[in-house]
Structures are given as structure tokens and as C-alpha cells.
Amino acid sequence: MTKTITPSSQGLDQKWYVIDATDQRLGRLACEVAKILRGKNKPTYTPHMDTGDFVIIINADKVAVTGRKSTQKLYRRHSGRPGGMKIETFEKLQQRIPERIIEKAVKGMLPKNALGRQLFTKLKVYPGPNHPHQAQKPEELTLNTIPNGDK
């Protein structure tokens, strides 16, 4: 007889967290957010279920990258038509649509299946300090994605 407890979707309490991305490192922030979305920070984590929490990221326009990535990192998209490839640097995309940078980084760290698409809908990213989710009473989560030697 097994004593393994499998959580059901009724017994899950999904919290809302708000994270300030000001001066946070992009990849390290995305990694932590992906863990929270999947529910890996909970003892009830189950790989095939959505046991994660909702995450609101504010100040997405102030996220940081190290080195020369701001000018060298490229974001590609394609319209699907011949010659429809568009390439943008991190710097230009941050000026135009800053929330897309964090969304692409987090989406790349989620599973590439139906569960990953469902988890991605629980991520809300906003370029400024305001968000429309006050009714959910999100609790502030402080992440330190800046290594000690890198100020």
C-alpha cells in the first residue's frame, strides 16, 4: 500500500506574488519565476499538474542584463511570409515592448507542452510600477538575482 499523496485541483491554494524587476538580472529572475509558476517551491509539487502560483512582475522596463548583451542579444520573430524575418536587439525591444523580454525568457524555461502553455497564462508582466491585480491581494516577493561580486 502506498502512502504517496497526489494533490487534487480542489485542494490547491494558489497565491499571487508581485515581483519588482528593477535592476534584477534577466535570466536569474526568469528562472525563479518559472519555478514559482510550476510550483517547485511547494511540497505539493507534481510534475503533471498545475500546482504553481500566479506571478505579477512590475517595472519590466528596468530589468538588467550583464556584459554587452544589451547591444548583442537578438530577438527574432517571423511573420510567416517570405522575407518576413524581423530582428531586434535587447535595447530596442526594451524601449518598444519591455514586457516581451521577460515573457520570452520565462516561456523558454517552462515545459514545451499544453501544461507549459497553461502555466504561462499565470504570468502577468507590466512595464511600470502599477498593475490591475490589487483585488487578488498579491504578496510582495523579494528575489535577489544580483550576485555578491556584481554590484
Curated annotation (Swiss-Prot):
<feature type="compositionally biased region" description="Polar residues">
    <location>
        <begin position="142"/>
        <end position="151"/>
    </location>
</feature>
<comment type="subunit">
    <text>Part of the 50S ribosomal subunit.</text>
</comment>
<comment type="similarity">
    <text>Belongs to the universal ribosomal protein uL13 family.</text>
</comment>
<feature type="region of interest" description="Disordered">
    <location>
        <begin position="126"/>
        <end position="151"/>
    </location>
</feature>
<dbReference type="InterPro" id="IPR005822">
    <property type="entry name" value="Ribosomal_uL13"/>
</dbReference>
<dbReference type="GO" id="GO:0006412">
    <property type="term" value="P:translation"/>
</dbReference>
<dbReference type="InterPro" id="IPR023563">
    <property type="entry name" value="Ribosomal_uL13_CS"/>
</dbReference>
<dbReference type="GO" id="GO:0003729">
    <property type="term" value="F:mRNA binding"/>
</dbReference>
<dbReference type="InterPro" id="IPR036899">
    <property type="entry name" value="Ribosomal_uL13_sf"/>
</dbReference>
<keyword id="KW-0687">Ribonucleoprotein</keyword>
<keyword id="KW-0689">Ribosomal protein</keyword>
<dbReference type="GO" id="GO:0022625">
    <property type="term" value="C:cytosolic large ribosomal subunit"/>
</dbReference>
<dbReference type="Pfam" id="PF00572">
    <property type="entry name" value="Ribosomal_L13"/>
</dbReference>
<comment type="function">
    <text>This protein is one of the early assembly proteins of the 50S ribosomal subunit, although it is not seen to bind rRNA by itself. It is important during the early stages of 50S assembly.</text>
</comment>
<dbReference type="GO" id="GO:0017148">
    <property type="term" value="P:negative regulation of translation"/>
</dbReference>
<dbReference type="InterPro" id="IPR005823">
    <property type="entry name" value="Ribosomal_uL13_bac-type"/>
</dbReference>
<dbReference type="GO" id="GO:0003735">
    <property type="term" value="F:structural constituent of ribosome"/>
</dbReference>
<protein>
    <recommendedName>
        <fullName>Large ribosomal subunit protein uL13</fullName>
    </recommendedName>
</protein>
